Amino acid sequence: MLSHNTMMKQRKQQATAIMKEVHGNDVDGMDLGKKVSIPRDIMLEELSHLSNRGARLFKMRQRRSDKYTFENFQYQSRAQINHSIAMQNGKVDGSNLEGGSQQAPLTPPNTPDPRSPPNPDNIAPGYSGPLKEIPPEKFNTTAVPKYYQSPWEQAISNDPELLEALYPKLFKPEGKAELPDYRSFNRVATPFGGFEKASRMVKFKVPDFELLLLTDPRFMSFVNPLSGRRSFNRTPKGWISENIPIVITTEPTDDTTVPESEDL
């Protein structure tokens, strides 16, 4: 009787034989698909679907860029022809590469020779020179619009009264009437006796004031008006005292020493 291990091996061999027949003999194992997707693959997969708005905008932009992209098919065809001719003539050979000699890269056609002086016809074909015969444009001239005059204005152009009625004007201020020349005593202060008797110079005396020193108690009272205010929070003081410091003695009141008499 076969053991359990041999039976499992036979079943595995049968399963592998069936898988080879289904997928072919070249396949060694099962294709389990992609295990990990990088962010770039995920982004390209999302842009390939047209379900979201961003993918549609990306496709429109790609089509627009392809529309305005210029591809030089003529240059590519010429390069292929030159390469095929070189292959036929035997110019391209592997022995040159083995010897260490390297060929110069093929230059595109219609490339001017850098050793020769530049020719304007090669750089820009069709350019013959500056346009000296054509006068330059006048950019600084100001275009004045044409004035339009309606038929009504043409009909009443000869009548100034109708023109004034058509275009109302602002009212002009009326001229001020001449006021009588009255003398005013309100604006100028006239001294007693007139200006002749008044002194020509106005004398001003600076008032005398006493400067207080910084150490003066009166100055300190101005700086800190609460300095002379009585405080009941820290040290108890009497009601009659004038902020006189109270001296508290620390000596004991009871005398512990007993006096001795002459008899003892």
From Swiss-Prot:
<keyword id="KW-0597">Phosphoprotein</keyword>
<feature type="region of interest" description="Disordered">
    <location>
        <begin position="90"/>
        <end position="135"/>
    </location>
</feature>
<dbReference type="GO" id="GO:0030017">
    <property type="term" value="C:sarcomere"/>
</dbReference>
<dbReference type="GO" id="GO:0070885">
    <property type="term" value="P:negative regulation of calcineurin-NFAT signaling cascade"/>
</dbReference>
<dbReference type="GO" id="GO:0031433">
    <property type="term" value="F:telethonin binding"/>
</dbReference>
<feature type="modified residue" description="Phosphothreonine">
    <location>
        <position position="111"/>
    </location>
</feature>
<keyword id="KW-0225">Disease variant</keyword>
<protein>
    <recommendedName>
        <fullName>Myozenin-2</fullName>
    </recommendedName>
</protein>
<dbReference type="GO" id="GO:0015629">
    <property type="term" value="C:actin cytoskeleton"/>
</dbReference>
<comment type="similarity">
    <text>Belongs to the myozenin family.</text>
</comment>
<dbReference type="GO" id="GO:0051373">
    <property type="term" value="F:FATZ binding"/>
</dbReference>
<comment type="subunit">
    <text>Interacts via its C-terminus with spectrin repeats 3 and 4 of ACTN2. Interacts with ACTN1, LDB3, MYOT and PPP3CA.</text>
</comment>
<dbReference type="GO" id="GO:0003779">
    <property type="term" value="F:actin binding"/>
</dbReference>
<dbReference type="InterPro" id="IPR008438">
    <property type="entry name" value="MYOZ"/>
</dbReference>
<dbReference type="GO" id="GO:0030018">
    <property type="term" value="C:Z disc"/>
</dbReference>
<feature type="modified residue" description="Omega-N-methylarginine">
    <location>
        <position position="53"/>
    </location>
</feature>
<feature type="modified residue" description="Phosphothreonine">
    <location>
        <position position="107"/>
    </location>
</feature>
<dbReference type="GO" id="GO:0000122">
    <property type="term" value="P:negative regulation of transcription by RNA polymerase II"/>
</dbReference>
<feature type="modified residue" description="Phosphoserine">
    <location>
        <position position="101"/>
    </location>
</feature>
<dbReference type="GO" id="GO:0007519">
    <property type="term" value="P:skeletal muscle tissue development"/>
</dbReference>
<dbReference type="GO" id="GO:0030346">
    <property type="term" value="F:protein phosphatase 2B binding"/>
</dbReference>
<feature type="compositionally biased region" description="Pro residues">
    <location>
        <begin position="106"/>
        <end position="120"/>
    </location>
</feature>
<dbReference type="Pfam" id="PF05556">
    <property type="entry name" value="Calsarcin"/>
</dbReference>
<feature type="modified residue" description="Phosphoserine">
    <location>
        <position position="116"/>
    </location>
</feature>
<dbReference type="GO" id="GO:0043503">
    <property type="term" value="P:skeletal muscle fiber adaptation"/>
</dbReference>
<comment type="function">
    <text>Myozenins may serve as intracellular binding proteins involved in linking Z line proteins such as alpha-actinin, gamma-filamin, TCAP/telethonin, LDB3/ZASP and localizing calcineurin signaling to the sarcomere. Plays an important role in the modulation of calcineurin signaling. May play a role in myofibrillogenesis.</text>
</comment>
<keyword id="KW-0488">Methylation</keyword>
<keyword id="KW-0122">Cardiomyopathy</keyword>
<dbReference type="GO" id="GO:0045214">
    <property type="term" value="P:sarcomere organization"/>
</dbReference>
<keyword id="KW-0963">Cytoplasm</keyword>
